[in-house]
């Protein structure tokens, strides 16, 4: 089963979100992330037999995807946010921006969320996937050290 790191960019927090701009993802068969824009394609993607891995996906991504696209939470998922808090308790900051600094993958700065181009949303989303891919590799390594 493919371990698949993903992220989505939307138009707001859970109380106002009504649009998904892009879903980007990477699995172990890919060198670079790919992106999906079409709502039907996004729905089909989350029906695939994969392990879906993301940062804060339980608290935001899947609730937002459910609200906008009626996407059900997959059976197999890993949220790297609480996992990082548990396995890296002394870190202090658990946002992808800080991890991006650690891994040499800068998180793009956004000043105007409402007027980005599709390319801007995609670049940000794919950058988050690259950062989270590195984080997932670290977390998986720590889990293997603990549990073999």
Roles of regions detected by a PLM:
Residues 98-120:
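A short, charged helix-loop
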Residues 74, 114-148:
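Mixed-charge, glycine-rich, non-catalytic linkers/tails in nucleic-acid processing enzymes
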Residues 40, 59, 90-93, 123-133:
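Conserved structured core elements
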Residues 1-90:
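Conserved RNase H-like, two-metal-ion catalytic cores of nucleic-acid enzymes
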Residues 38, 100, 145-148:
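Short alpha-helical "patches" and their helix-cap loops
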Residues 66, 77-101, 108, 133, ...:
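Charged catalytic and DNA/RNA-contacting regions of genome-maintenance
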